[in-house]
């Protein structure tokens, strides 16, 4: 499928697969509880774990992130350019839905400059949820055909290429810089 078709599927609260910096991600509209529930069911992922949001700019995160709790140094870190993709755990707004934050008072966000992510966010007007496109026990998909093998020939997949990163993103706490997952 092309970008416009995938954007339409996202607007219709479908779960889609799209390329990111290292692997294909599964994503949906983060403001749609029904879409997020479909995603969690598909991945057999407990809601308590929370989800990552990706977008090309901070503006897409404004509905979810409590920027008043982020100081200038932390904001600079959040906007920094790094050797590897970096996901940051940041304070969430009290209005951010539980189905995104899980059991936490924070949310995971990643500024992503991958052209596919940038285009989908700009076409839809929202950030995307992002979890690796793979079934439990299977390796993450790096090409569109692998997504179709795992999720079926009719699964909505943006047929573009992943970036050059070798590993999924590093995950760090923005306030403490604590490393949760090595990238």
From Swiss-Prot:
Superkingdom of origin: Bacteria
Enzyme Commission number(s) from the entry: 2.7.7.87
GO BP annotations listed: regulation of translational fidelity; tRNA threonylcarbamoyladenosine modification
Primary site of residence: cytoplasm
Record keyword Cell cycle present: no
Location within or outside the cell: Cytoplasm
Principal EC category: transferase
Keywords from the UniProt entry: ATP-binding, Cytoplasm, Nucleotide-binding, Nucleotidyltransferase, Transferase, tRNA processing
Function: Required for the formation of a threonylcarbamoyl group on adenosine at position 37 (t(6)A37) in tRNAs that read codons beginning with adenine. Catalyzes the conversion of L-threonine, HCO(3)(-)/CO(2) and ATP to give threonylcarbamoyl-AMP (TC-AMP) as the acyladenylate intermediate, with the release of diphosphate.
Similarity-based family: Belongs to the SUA5 family. TsaC subfamily.
Protein name, UniProt field: Threonylcarbamoyl-AMP synthase
């Amino acid at each position: 499928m092309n970008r416009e078709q995938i954007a339409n599927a996202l607007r219709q609260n479908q779960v889609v697969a799209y390329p990111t910096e290292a692997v294909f991600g599964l994503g949906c509209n983060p403001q749609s509880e029904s879409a997020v529930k479909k995603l969690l069911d598909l991945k057999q992922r407990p809601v308590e774990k929370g989800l990552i949001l990706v977008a090309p700019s901070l503006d897409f995160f404004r509905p979810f992130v409590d920027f008043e709790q982020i100081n200038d140094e932390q904001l600079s870190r959040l906007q920094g350019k790094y050797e590897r993709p970096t996901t940051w755990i940041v304070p969430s707004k009290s209005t951010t839905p539980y189905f995104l934050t899980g059991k936490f008072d924070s949310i995971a966000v990643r500024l992503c400059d991958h052209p596919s992510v940038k285009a989908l966010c700009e076409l839809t007007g929202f950030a995307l949820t992002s979890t690796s496109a793979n079934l439990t026990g299977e390796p993450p998909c790096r090409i569109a055909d692998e997504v179709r093998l795992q999720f079926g020939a009719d699964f909505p997949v943006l047929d573009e290429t992943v970036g050059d990163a070798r590993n999924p993103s590093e995950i760090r706490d923005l306030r403490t810089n604590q490393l949760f997952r090595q990238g």
